[in-house]
Structure formats: structure tokens, C-alpha cells
């Protein structure tokens, strides 16, 4: 019995020691708006802690160990949402210099080289009521970041591994001889998505899905249709929520490199626009 009591005592001491270590290295406090204690780092994802995950690459404030410039904290009142100020018209946010800077990275061997244009993007955006007034700069940075990732930095306008993507549907039946593989900057797929997008936009996309790959304006319109329907409702939850809506299969540690690719695009565009990214960047 004495041996058993000693073993239990040692196990309890070890448990308390583990809790102490965890308390020193992992913190759930969000620092996007409130900041961290003086001895803690604010991570790229907006949480306080002391390990390399907090103080390394992307560290916003505190005793950062990364050699890169820390990301500024979210200003008071900005919260983590992508619909927060600052705002401006779509033309003033997506300037020729900003858009051309994105497209300058499209390689000469890319199938979509020269396909996506600023004129098409602006025209597509202005066909939606949501973008006819002023828009949140964070939302546009997030939108272009997700479009960049999905299209391979705007290298592609059509999916490489093409399939039929035909699902039985009474409302949007497949047209014989037509395939509904990914097209456009967000790679819209399946007959029911082409049908619903076409109905909303007033375009015959169910019978002519290739229109998305022929017209840059239609390509952006389809992507923005998907964005407004599925992504825009979660803008107040931060950039990570947009990734979950577009491809939730990457989240919860399943495809961290893909998630980070999206985050990197977003941070780059935020820097270009001179805005802070907000909190909750990952999913």
C-alpha cells in the first residue's frame, strides 16, 4: 500500500508539473484587439504565448524571435472581421498598380496568362449590389487571396484534372456532352453550381459552361457569385472562416501548407493595401 500511495503521489506531482508547463507555454487569450502581457508574444493568428509558434514567424508583438517585421496589432474597433473599416470604392481599392502587381507574378507558361484583367474584375464586382458603394479593404484582400490560391496565382482558368462533375438534378440537369469541372478564379464545379450561378447572372452556363473560361468578366462574376452566397456571411469571423467555407477539408490541421498559402496571399495583399489583417487567420 505504501508503494501504491507513493506512486499515486508521484503521478499527481507529475500532473501538476505538466499543467504548470502548459500554462506557461499555451494561452487561449486573443491578442488581436487587447494585446498580451509584457512577457508574452502575440502570434500571427492572434493568440498569446511564449513558444516559437507564438514568437516566431508572423509574431505581431511582444518578445518576438523572428527576424521578420512583426504584423501590427489590429487597431481598436477593427476587430477580426473582414467587413471592418477602412473602406473605399472598388476602383480605389483595386487600383491598376495593385492589380498589375498581382498579375505580374503570372508566369509566361501559364494557360491563363493575360486572361484575368482589372477591367473584368471591376465590371464583375459592380454587377453585384454589395460592391456598388464602398467596400471593406480587408474583404477585397481576402477575396483576391482566395482567388489567387484557387487559381494557382491566376495561372489557370480551367481545372487541370478535369472530370464530368455531373450530379442528378431536376432543377439543373446536365447538358449532354458538357462537363462541369472547375473554371474561373475560384474553380466553380458541378452542374448545380453552374446552373444556379447562370440563373443568378442571367447567363446560359448550364448549356455553355465554357463561357466561364472564355470571358474573364464571367469568370470573376461566377467566383463572386460563390463568394457572396457562401463566404460573405462569415466575413465577421475573420479570414480563417473564408477558407473553411471554400475548402473546409484543409482545416483542423489536415492540410496546413494549403491553409498557410491562403494566409500568405492575404497578408501580402493587406500589406500592399496598408491595412492590418485582423485576427483568426487560420482554420
Curated annotation (Swiss-Prot):
Q: What sequence ranges are listed for the domain Chitin-binding type-1?
A: 29-66
Query: Which superkingdom is the protein from?
Result: Eukaryota
Q: Which GO terms describe its cellular component?
A: apoplast; secretory vesicle
EC number, UniProt record: 3.2.1.14
Active site, renumbered? 150
Q: What Gene Ontology molecular function terms does this protein carry?
A: chitin binding; endochitinase activity
Q: Which keywords are on file for this protein?
A: Carbohydrate metabolism, Chitin degradation, Chitin-binding, Disulfide bond, Glycoprotein, Glycosidase, Hydrolase, Plant defense, Polysaccharide degradation, Signal
Q: What class of enzyme is it?
A: hydrolase
Concerning InterPro entries, the annotation shows:
Chitin-bd_1, Chitin-binding_1_CS, Endochitinase-like_sf, Glyco_hydro_19, Glyco_hydro_19_cat, Lysozyme-like_dom_sf
The keyword Signal appears for this protein:
yes
Question: Which reaction is recorded as catalysed by this protein?
Answer: Random endo-hydrolysis of N-acetyl-beta-D-glucosaminide (1->4)-beta-linkages in chitin and chitodextrins
Show which residues constitute the signal peptide: 1-28
Which family is it part of? Belongs to the glycosyl hydrolase 19 family. Chitinase class I subfamily.
* Name used for this protein in its record: Endochitinase At2g43620
Q: Which organism is it from?
A: Arabidopsis thaliana
Amino acid at each position: 500500500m505504501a508503494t501504491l500511495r507513493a506512486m499515486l503521489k508521484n503521478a499527481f506531482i507529475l500532473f501538476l508539473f505538466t499543467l504548470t508547463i502548459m500554462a506557461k507555454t499555451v494561452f487561449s487569450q486573443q491578442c488581436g484587439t487587447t494585446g498580451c502581457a509584457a512577457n508574452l508574444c502575440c502570434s500571427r493568428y492572434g493568440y498569446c504565448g511564449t513558444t516559437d509558434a507564438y514568437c516566431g514567424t508572423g509574431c505581431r508583438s511582444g518578445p518576438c524571435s523572428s527576424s521578420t517585421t512583426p504584423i501590427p496589432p489590429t487597431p481598436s474597433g477593427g476587430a477580426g472581421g473582414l467587413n471592418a473599416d477602412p473602406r473605399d470604392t472598388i476602383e480605389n481599392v483595386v487600383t491598376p498598380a495593385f492589380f498589375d502587381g498581382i498579375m505580374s507574378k503570372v508566369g509566361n507558361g501559364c494557360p491563363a496568362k493575360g486572361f484575368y484583367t482589372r477591367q473584368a474584375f471591376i465590371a464583375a464586382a459592380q454587377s453585384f449590389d454589395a460592391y456598388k458603394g464602398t467596400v471593406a479593404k480587408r474583404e477585397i484582400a481576402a477575396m483576391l487571396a482566395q482567388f489567387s490560391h484557387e487559381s494557382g496565382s491566376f495561372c489557370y482558368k480551367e481545372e487541370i484534372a478535369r472530370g464530368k462533375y455531373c450530379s442528378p438534378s431536376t432543377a439543373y440537369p446536365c447538358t449532354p456532352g458538357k462537363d462541369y469541372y472547375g473554371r474561373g478564379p475560384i474553380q466553380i464545379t458541378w452542374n448545380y453550381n453552374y446552373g444556379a450561378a447562370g440563373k443568378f447572372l442571367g447567363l446560359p452556363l448550364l448549356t455553355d459552361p465554357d463561357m466561364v473560361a472564355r470571358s474573364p468578366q464571367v469568370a470573376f462574376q461566377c467566383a463572386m457569385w460563390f463568394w457572396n452566397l457562401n463566404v460573405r456571411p462569415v466575413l465577421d469571423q475573420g479570414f480563417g472562416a473564408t477558407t473553411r467555407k471554400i475548402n473546409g477539408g484543409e482545416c483542423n490541421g489536415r492540410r496546413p501548407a494549403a491553409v498557410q498559402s491562403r494566409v500568405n496571399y492575404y497578408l501580402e495583399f493587406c500589406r500592399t493595401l496598408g491595412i492590418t489583417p485582423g485576427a483568426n487567420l487560420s482554420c
